């Protein structure tokens, strides 16, 4: 073999080596791409699994498009326009609740969401549910749902009343915490207007937090009372009589009435005024409280409402000690509607008498209710904080709600969500 042939063989060998290296590199790149695709598919599957929760009663899955910092556990609550899931915040290992809201089908739902969002950001109180974080959308175009990260509360008072007998100590503590939250809300010039057992959240430590501020309004703003009634679709059992009798203005007394209804329900294990409709609701109230006297009668400004009350049979007031006598004498140990209570604290009935007064001007105030002897064990004026008053323009969107489209409200919600907490 001459030198030229030797060089030619070397060149052929080098070309073969280069081809083999190129093939090996191409195979390695293909394998890497395949592995990357598999990893992406696995990550997507994991994210889909993480972002879906299934109710025990239904096979349907609910998509939660939240940060991968959260591991979705299960659905813990569901309402007309929101679903709440429990989740774990992975970095801190803290259990939280994530509330998914899809309000953009109806203006009313947008308004309720905007009120709640603004108020929960305003308050910072131990007995009012707080927002820990908000899942912010990438941009306005992708803004189709709202995710609020909140404290996780295991249950609510409605479920507790239905499943167990409450001790007098529990009742005192729950009413105290409710009034403590109301003191802060009313000091901020805010009426809740939808207090009921299902809106009082509880945890295993018996801590209570008020939620659902979708119907709340400013005390100073009374222009929208008619609009309030058209929107008031919640359970009527806890509504103050002045709401149904269209008083000219509503005061903090409407929330106080609701607290009275809740106290009565905890004492007996059943709703006190479970009206079937508007008329039956008023009749049940008057069956217990009696027909209004002349002073209270003329405090009702609506002539039509006064005429309706005059058309009803006269009722004599039933003292709560007598009304609850059947409960006191009940020796049942079941968890039925009777509550199974064999003894009711007379101080609880005394407070109830002051909470459930027909005339709102004569009803006990939150501050005086906190001082009542029934709550003496918990009352501490140095640990019942007030809140900053809401600005005058806080609820301006409500004043012009008839002119606002869903798109207008969506923009307001987007702006509110993008603001820092």
Swiss-Prot record:
A single GO BP term for this record reads: cellular response to starvation
Q: Where is this motif: TXY?
A: 230-232
Q: What class of enzyme is it?
A: transferase
Q: Which residues bind ATP?
A: 76-84, 99
The active site lies at: 194
Please list the cofactors this protein needs: Mg(2+)
Name the domain of life this protein comes from: Eukaryota
List the catalytic activities from the record: L-seryl-[protein] + ATP = O-phospho-L-seryl-[protein] + ADP + H(+); L-threonyl-[protein] + ATP = O-phospho-L-threonyl-[protein] + ADP + H(+)
Report a single Gene Ontology molecular function. Answer: MAP kinase activity
According to the UniProt entry, how is activity regulated? Activated by tyrosine and threonine phosphorylation.
| Keyword Transferase part of the UniProt annotation | yes
**Residue limits of the Protein kinase domain?**
70-375
Keyword list, A-Z: ATP-binding, Cell cycle, Cell division, Kinase, Mitosis, Nucleotide-binding, Phosphoprotein, Serine/threonine-protein kinase, Transferase
Q: Which residues carry this modification: Phosphotyrosine?
A: 232
Instruction: Provide the record's note on post-translational modification.
Output: Dually phosphorylated on Thr-230 and Tyr-232, which activates the enzyme.
CDD domains found in the cross-reference section: STKc_ERK1_2_like (cd07849)
Q: Report the EC number(s), separated by commas if there are several.
A: 2.7.11.24
Q: Which residues carry this modification: Phosphothreonine?
A: 230
Gene Ontology cellular component list: cytoplasm; nucleus
Domain remark in the UniProt entry: The TXY motif contains the threonine and tyrosine residues whose phosphorylation activates the MAP kinases.
- Its protein name is Extracellular signal-regulated kinase 1
Q: Which organism is it from?
A: Candida albicans (strain SC5314 / ATCC MYA-2876) (Yeast)
